[in-house]
């Protein structure tokens, strides 16, 4: 009898641990918000200020490209309570921030992200060192090599005229289909937020008069 009781206790403990862990993760995720559509000029300080009117903001993070250091156009805001997070979603989703309309939703993948700046830097260094060990023999300038790979990937993709240019495309050369042909275009910071079609001009062919 004592053996059965002890065994039952272990079984109950084994079941409760995963369930409580899962519930904790769901609660953790519901207080973290994903902020999309950020302008290139929005940093972590201005992002936190934008949500400071909602009580309980503990952290604001803007995700950046580790090669260029530029914003990827999205970030995360952490709240103490679910009520504050829900209020922020209702009030801020679709609103304008630094000239860009932002989207605000519950962060689905937040638990997989680093929990602190130190962890984020450590993880980035590990990935960078691993990538350098594979790439340094191909090109001694690793940053230039990574940028070349990024540009090559973007060049292979043909962008629609209706697509919006995001901050992560800056310094990349892309191909845009203008309805007749594919136009190469260099993306600069001034083009962020515009449609690809604004820069996919159709070349007019001049017809020469036939000699009589």
Swiss-Prot record:
GO terms for molecular function: mRNA binding; RNA binding; structural constituent of ribosome. One of its GO terms (biological process) is translation. It is found in: Mitochondrion. Residues 31-109 form the RRM domain. It comes from the Eukaryota. Pfam families: Ribosomal_S19, RRM_1. Residues 1-29 form a transit peptide. Keywords: Mitochondrion, Ribonucleoprotein, Ribosomal protein, RNA-binding, Transit peptide. Component of the mitochondrial ribosome small subunit. PANTHER family: RIBOSOMAL PROTEIN S19P FAMILY MEMBER, SMALL RIBOSOMAL SUBUNIT PROTEIN US19M. The RNA-binding domain found in RPS19 may functionally replace the missing mitochondrial RPS13. Belongs to the universal ribosomal protein uS19 family. HAMAP family: Ribosomal_uS19 (MF_00531). This is Small ribosomal subunit protein uS19m. The gene is RPS19.
